[in-house]
Amino acid sequence: MGVSRRLSEHTNERRTTINDANDKVSAFPFETYGVDELESVLSSVGKLWNFDIWFVHGATGQSISIVAKYLFAKYELKTTYGISDIVIDTYFQTLEKSYKNNPYHNSCHAADVLHTLLYFFTQSNYASSLEPLDMLTSIIAALGHDVGHPGLTNRFLVNNREEVAIQYNDSSVLENMHCSKTFSLMGKKDCNLFEKLSNEDWLKARKSIIEMILETDMSRHFEILGRFRTRALVLSDLNLDNFDDRVLIFSMGLKCADIGHSAKVPELHEKWTKLVCDEFFNQGDIEKSRKQPVSMYCDRDHADIAKSQAGFLKNICIPLFEVW
C-alpha cells in the first residue's frame, strides 16, 4: 500500500519493557496458574497469532480487565495521558461486567479481538506508524465493540420491535448501542479514561472509536470492503498522515480482527465456531417459541455447519483478508 511513517520520538521515549508491564499485572489475583506463568502468556498478546485468550480467562476469571491493564502498562498510556490506575481498573472492570454471558459475544471475544487487532498493527508495516492515541483508541474500540450484546442479531431486534431497535432507528442497532455504552461508561465515577485528553485528541479518539465499532456491522461489510479495496489497491493513495485514512485503516483492522479466528489454527477456529453457532441456535429457539420464521443459520435441527462455514470463509473472510 506504500503506507510508511516513522514512529514519533514521543512514542519511542515512552515505550516500556515487558517486565515493567508485568509489575502492573501482578496486582491481579491468579487462582489457577502462577503469576510468572501468566505474565509469560500475556507477553504473547499481539505477538503470537494463535494466542488463546481462554487460557487467561480460565486462570483469572477475567479477560478484558487483565489484558487492558497489561497493555496500558506496556505502552505507557497511563503516563502519556495522565490516567490513574484506579480509572484504568474501574473502567475496564465495569466494561467487562457490562458484557453478557453469551456463548460467543462475550468479554473473551472482545479480548481476543483486541489481541488479533494488535497483531495486525504491530507485526506489520503499520507498526512504524502507530501513535499513542492510535493505541489508546484501538484498545478501547476493540474491547467495547460488542459490550452489552444480547446474543441476538440486528434483524431479530428490528423484527421484534425491541426497544434498542426503536432507540437507534433500526440502523446498525447493536453497533450504535456498543458505541454508546463504551462512551457512557466513562461518565461513571472513576471511569473517565479521556479526562485529561486535549479537546483535539478527544474529538479524534471519539470519531475513531465510533467509526471502528460501526464498521463491524456485517450489513456494511461489502461497502467498506469495496471502499478500502479501491483506495488501497486501485488508487493506492491511502495516507497515514491523513486522519480519515487512518480511521479507515483501523476500521478495516478491527473488521478483520472481529472474524480473525477464521484464519487461526483449527482448534481455535472450531472452538469459536461452535460458540457462535450455539448463540445462533439460542436465537432460533426463541423464534420457534414465538412461532416466527427461523433466521438463517439459527435452526439447530437443520444446521449444516460445515457448509455454512465454507461459504463464510469463501465469500466473507478470504476476500477481506486478501485486501487487508
Label every PLM stretch briefly.
Residues G2-I66, Y70-L77, Y104, Y119-P132, ...:
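Divalent metal-dependent phosphate-bond-processing catalytic cores, especially two-metal-ion Mg2+/Mn2+ enzymes
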Residues E76-N102, T122:
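Internal amphipathic alpha-helical repeat/solenoid segments
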Residues C108:
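N-terminal active-site segment of His-dependent metallophosphoesterases
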Residues L136:
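"…together with the soluble PPM/PP2C metallo-phosphatase catalytic core" -> "…together
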